[in-house]
Amino acid sequence: IRIEGDGMDASRTAQADLLARAVEVNAGIWADKVNVITGVGQFDLEGRLVGSLPTDSPSPEWSIDTAELGGMYANKIRLVANEHGVGVRNAGTVSAGQSGLTVTADGRLLNQGTVAAQGAIGLQAQQITTSGDIHAEGALALDADATIDNRDARTSGQGNVTVRADAIDNRDGELLAGAQLNMTADRHIDNDGGLFFGTQGLSLVTDSMAGNGQWLAQGEIEATIHGDYRHQGEMIAGGNLVL
């Protein structure tokens, strides 16, 4: 499915569902609810695989690809990329209302544009890389099996922000929470030149940690680091500081 030209205005319908192996968004999509479900097989409307289909054609590089001039604008947006190893790319704008945004990808999630919601945002992928802007006016959750790469990027939520991955790379990046910032990395966190900020507090659990960036919280900062720890930047807590 390719959206081009004047785009797709489904704002007068209750819901817009796009189901295909790959979806290219080169123009705007407007609706109250948008579901984009991609992959090879038979799926129910929740995006679950209910039957397989044989194919000998090569996999696309991106199963959901929003170009710089493309965008999705809806009260609720749900993107599900089911094909193994095939990811989701956004170079445009994906903007949801109070009902929020969820993205689930069985590959890489690459954000080069703007991802925003008046409600909550949940992003889950094998790997998450952002060089653009991610902002939720509600809670924000990022979950990756491999690395979350937030270098030179700004990722924020007005509510709790939860970040979980094998490794978190926040060099020259910003991870900001209007409430509690919780980070868990099984292997390593790099915050060289970066900023971790939690209004209510900041929690960090990892095996090793490095960087000269800032850790700031108006409440408590609590860090559990099982192995190597090298930090040369500021660490300021309005409450307890527990290492």
Describe the residue ranges of each PLM region.
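Extracellular and secretory-pathway beta-repeat/beta-biased strand scaffolds
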Residues: I1-L243
